[in-house]
């Protein structure tokens, strides 16, 4: 989508979030403007991702095939460049010490700019237990509430997420926050010490706010929401 058209989409989304306008728009969700900013993902990193997937999920592949989940994150940093510089080097992550390095498919900046770092056909390490079936979206910022209170960033995030939902056939109940990972029915972790590992970003309470806004946008475009949320007891 051209930048001016993308701006119009974000403006319309922001207006909807503000309560202005309620007309139903049926059809395909427009693709938001996405800036391509790929991180290096050469054969070595792909092989490391396949080895990781074999250890943790029992599948020997780096391909992300038919993802079922979208996981929302925040970066605990203030600039896109700091996020990019964290994800680009293929080094063991500082928390769990494994390769490949952490990454996310998309980053939504504070001004509403959407960056794509990795194709959605490639696994990224962003959520323990779900990387084999999840698209990761990072938001530049330090808290859920900071992002929820930023109209441009929130509008871009919702438009991206809804577009991905329609493109990939992902249901609303499977749009989750990182903090909700353990209760996802898709959570799978073969390495026992990691089965309770999660993060504090995007709690259920804040994701309920996010999902309500996403549902309102989905209804306007006629995107099916799917069945009610299904949560499981953490297997740890």
What are these regions (language model features)?
Residues 69, 134-136, 174:
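Structural preference for beta-strand elements that scaffold enzyme active sites
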Residues 65, 99, 130, 146-154:
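Solvent-exposed, acidic/flexible segments
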Residues 58-59, 103-104, 141-151:
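Second-shell loop/turn segments in exported
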Residues 3-10, 16-127, 235:
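N-terminal catalytic cores of peptidoglycan-degrading enzymes
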Residues 75, 138-142:
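Short glycine-rich beta-strand segments
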Residues 128-139:
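Short coil-to-beta-strand
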Residues 25-46, 143-236:
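Basic/polar, cationic surfaces and motifs that engage anionic cell-wall
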